[in-house]
């Protein structure tokens, strides 16, 4: 069957990495995805639209699946983060970032890292509630609610169960913000009682930072609030080679948006130099979400073979290839994977045998 997927190419290097991702996904699915491109971010603003046009939101709500490249957020005003607006508009309450040491990635500082970071995505300091109290004094509010905390904990424990995880680490700073963080922890403890087969630990944020620097392999799944999750997920990406090899996903009720978590890199935009691996691995998550496990396995195998070969990598991965050359090399690896699976000479992938009866995740 075919799937309709909203595609937000993004800003800066976004269109280049999105093009590479589409080529790879079309290969492993046999072209069974109908891509519906829409604009957002500075690309939309340049066209006289809002940073997050209604057309983009309507498309995602209709298709219930989207994947996006990086979107620009002005640092000194202009408009609010489109990423935050997107999450809040669609109630994408759970951000999930798998962080793994990939075979052949020589830039990874640690081997054997395999952890899932789950981040509450809708409140905390990202609620956008700040104001100037008096001249020279600004107040920002950290909003934490029982409903949102329960929801992310239920999601995290269920995600751990369905993905074969054994240990959850609930991250907090209750010694400094006791009311908000203890509410978060109370919801975790309530949920923990329903999942006695998990090992659960409660770890202060500063302890986590130290432990990640010394032995990140001891962690299986990390669950935390919005700001903490944003910072720690980027830190963890640095442990395994950087944001260019780490995928991202945002989940809501019956809706999901997959994304590269790196920036727009305007200094190399339009120069065919960008690394598309992060967005391609995000597409792997997307394929698993819709039940296309065989296509997802095919895509991951191709990426891992590409990294192990080490011949056609972009500069941030230690090579000299451009985006197009990396993508061509990846398609060759995907072709080889398909040939080995069939026990014959390499040939184009036919798409997975598993079919989902409808477009419902």
Describe each PLM feature range.
Residues 6-28, 134-206, 218:
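Glycine-rich phosphate/diphosphate-binding loop of Rossmann-like nucleotide-binding domains
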Residues 32-55, 210-212:
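N-terminal beta-loop-helix "entrance" segment that forms/cooperates
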């Amino acid at each position: 069957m075919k799937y309709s997927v909203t595609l937000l190419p993004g800003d800066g290097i976004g269109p280049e990495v999105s093009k590479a991702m589409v080529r790879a996904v079309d290969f492993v699915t046999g072209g069974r995805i109908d891509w519906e491109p829409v604009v957002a971010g500075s690309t939309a603003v340049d066209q006289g639209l809002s940073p997050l046009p209604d057309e983009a939101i309507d498309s995602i709500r209709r298709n219930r699946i989207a994947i996006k490249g990086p979107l620009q957020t002005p640092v000194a005003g202009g408009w609010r983060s489109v990423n935050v607006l997107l999450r809040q508009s669609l109630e994408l309450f759970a951000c999930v970032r798998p962080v793994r040491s990939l075979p052949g990635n020589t830039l990874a500082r640690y081997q054997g890292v395999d952890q899932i970071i789950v981040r509450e995505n809708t409140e905390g300091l990202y609620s956008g509630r700040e104001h100037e109290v008096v001249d020279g004094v600004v107040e920002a509010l950290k909003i934490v609610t029982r409903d949102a905390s329960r929801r992310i904990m239920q999601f995290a424990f269920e995600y751990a169960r369905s993905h074969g995880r054994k240990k959850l680490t609930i991250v907090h700073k209750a010694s400094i913000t006791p009311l908000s963080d203890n509410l978060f922890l109370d919801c975790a403890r309530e949920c923990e009682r329903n999942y006695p087969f998990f090992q659960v630990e409660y770890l202060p944020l500063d302890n986590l930072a130290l432990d990640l620097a010394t032995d990140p392999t001891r962690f299986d799944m990390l669950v935390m609030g919005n700001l903490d999750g944003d910072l720690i997920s980027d830190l963890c990406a640095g442990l395994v080679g950087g944001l260019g090899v780490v995928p991202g996903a945002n989940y809501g009720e019956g809706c999901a948006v997959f994304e590269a978590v790196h920036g727009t890199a305007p200094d190399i935009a339009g120069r065919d130099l960008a690394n598309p691996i992060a967005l391609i691995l995000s597409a792997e998550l997307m394929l698993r979400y819709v039940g296309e496990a065989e296509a997802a396995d095919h895509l991951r195998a191709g990426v891992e073979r590409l990294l192990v070969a080490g011949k056609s990598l972009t500069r941030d991965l230690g090579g000299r290839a451009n985006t197009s050359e990396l993508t061509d090399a990846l398609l060759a690896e995907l072709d080889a994977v398909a040939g080995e699976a069939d026990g014959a000479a390499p040939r184009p992938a036919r798409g997975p045998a598993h079919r989902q009866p409808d477009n419902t995740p």
